[in-house]
Amino acid sequence: MKQLRLNPINCINGEINIPGSKSISNRVLLLATLARGSTTLTNLLDSDDIRYMLASLKQLGIQYTLSEDKTECVVEGNEGPISSASVQSLFLGNAGTAMRPLCAALTLGQGEFTLTGEPRMEERPIGDLVDALRQLGADVTYLKNDGFPPLTINATGLNGGDVEIAGDLSSQFLTALLMVAPLTKDSVNIKIKGELVSKPYIDITIALMKQFGVEVINHQYQRFEIKAGQHYVSPGKVLVEGDASSASYFLAAGAIKGGEVKVTGVGRLSIQGDVKFADALAQMGADIEWGDDYIIARKSTLTAIEMDMNHIPDAAMTIATAALFATGTTKLTNIYNWRIKETDRLAAMATELRKVGAIVEEGHDYITITPPAELNTAAIDTYNDHRMAMCFSMMAFADCGITINDPDCTSKTFPDYFAQFTQLAK
């Protein structure tokens, strides 16, 4: 197994332009596919999740050209649903941002499609989405366990009408349903069962759909209305914002050991909820400055916070490791959906924080972190989870440094993360 040793870093300073957002990249690839016209996507993320989406689109007959550095893609729109005369089997790795939307999109056309993935993907639920698609007339069959991939879709189009979907597990299910709703036979009324998690991710979806000419009427996140007869039309060019979750590591770094760190590609005008991470850092005492398309974090004394993290579940993980450098006990609540991500992130985070000496309480949907008087070095297991690897890079700011096992798992969203991170070290 590959290991990366991060020696103690005394100061971090500089500017970084964040790679494109994973969740925006895969959404716009699918919207551009379903749209009329050609769409040029710039600042596209080059990572595993995006490669799985691109490979699947190519297999389905979608035409696109990708620049040499893989950050610009020109997609020739399919002008509606994807159909296939031959049986298609698509392998989607552990890419939830490809599995969920494609599962929904492939019910719209005609054909037989099987979606498979890595073993972890077979543990990541999709039942809430499939239940909703079945209400609209989809024919979906599970191949192993009910409610989980792999699955087969016998596509004949979707009817539209009233549909209920659970909102308490993952916002990706609703995102997938929203993106296909305009292409059903009738208007769609979506009613949310339970509390909707990660609302800002739904805002991203609705904003991107609007860019492609489709209106969603949002009734306080309880009900969503999508009128029939709408079509996706290419806006011509789409700039993919920098990934706000990826920005969180550099902002936390600036707050813990700045100097100052300026992150460009996200800012006040961002459509991503994860930029609110900077507000959480500010509550801990960090010195934060906002621009339209940048955020600066400067060093300050950090104190513990107690916060509901439902609105920023991915970036909240960075608060868990930043808490090692704050005075007091930090409590992050309403984070049950950490458990159904790339790994069970709640269990993984608790285990690894204890390795470096933190006192940790792991609840069903919360975690508390109290830093020790002195942090210990350790070899951090990353569970094939990009965010675990990046979060624990913060331990480089401890006097003991840290070892990261399997550092290349960052390829899911940020392949050269550690190179960029160490470049800012003084």
UniProtKB/Swiss-Prot annotation:
GO terms for biological process: amino acid biosynthetic process; aromatic amino acid family biosynthetic process; chorismate biosynthetic process. The gene is aroA. It catalyses: 3-phosphoshikimate + phosphoenolpyruvate = 5-O-(1-carboxyvinyl)-3-phosphoshikimate + phosphate. CDD domains: EPSP_synthase. HAMAP family: EPSP_synth. This is 3-phosphoshikimate 1-carboxyvinyltransferase. It is found in: Cytoplasm. Coiled coil: none annotated. Belongs to the EPSP synthase family. Phosphoenolpyruvate binds at K22, G96, R124, Q172, R345, R387, K412. Pathway: Metabolic intermediate biosynthesis; chorismate biosynthesis; chorismate from D-erythrose 4-phosphate and phosphoenolpyruvate: step 6/7. The active site is at D314. GO terms for cellular component: cytoplasm. It is an enzyme of class 2 (transferase). 3-phosphoshikimate binds at K22, S23, R27, S170, S171, Q172, S198, D314, N337, K341.
